[in-house]
Curated annotation (Swiss-Prot):
Species name: Dehalococcoides mccartyi (strain ATCC BAA-2100 / JCM 16839 / KCTC 5957 / BAV1)
Function: Binds to 23S rRNA. Forms part of two intersubunit bridges in the 70S ribosome.
Gene field: rplN
Database matches in Pfam families: Ribosomal_L14
Name of the protein in question: Large ribosomal subunit protein uL14
SMART domains the UniProt entry points to: Ribosomal_L14
Listed SUPFAM superfamilies: Ribosomal protein L14 (SSF50193)
């Protein structure tokens, strides 16, 4: 689960490397974000020629979490790291490539562009 102050890897080619969650969107008292939830985050580490510079506030969707979570069919899935993809104002991915696997739950949340760019969908 991702909550305030959680640091996540960035799974796209915007140039940002690490982000820190500031807030979880989607409810007045929503504390934890799961796969497919949108968060507000601050870019903590980026490459010098990045689209998302260090210190900027961005919106991102969580694509991988380390905590095991149950699917409706009864199976469990977990990933090796917490990762997110940075979004633009239209809730589309800002980058043109996605690195690493992403969860199938993004399809239910209408992030089909991320699924089409991802090399593997679990």
């Amino acid at each position: 689960m991702v909550q305030q102050y959680t640091r996540l890897n960035v799974a796209d080619n915007t140039g940002a490397k690490k982000i820190m969650c500031i807030n979880v969107l989607g409810g007045s008292h929503k504390i934890q974000a799961k796969v497919g939830d949108v968060i507000v985050a601050a870019v903590k580490k980026s490459s010098p020629d990045a689209q998302a510079k260090s210190g900027t506030v961005v919106k991102a969707v969580v694509v991988r979490i380390t905590k095991p979570y149950a699917r409706p069919d009864g199976s469990y899935i977990k990933f090796d790291d917490n990762a997110a993809v940075i979004l633009n104002d239209k809730m589309e991915p800002k980058g043109t490539r996605i690195f690493g696997p992403v969860a199938r739950e993004l399809r239910d949340k209408k992030f089909t562009k991320i699924l089409s760019l991802a090399p593997e969908v679990l």
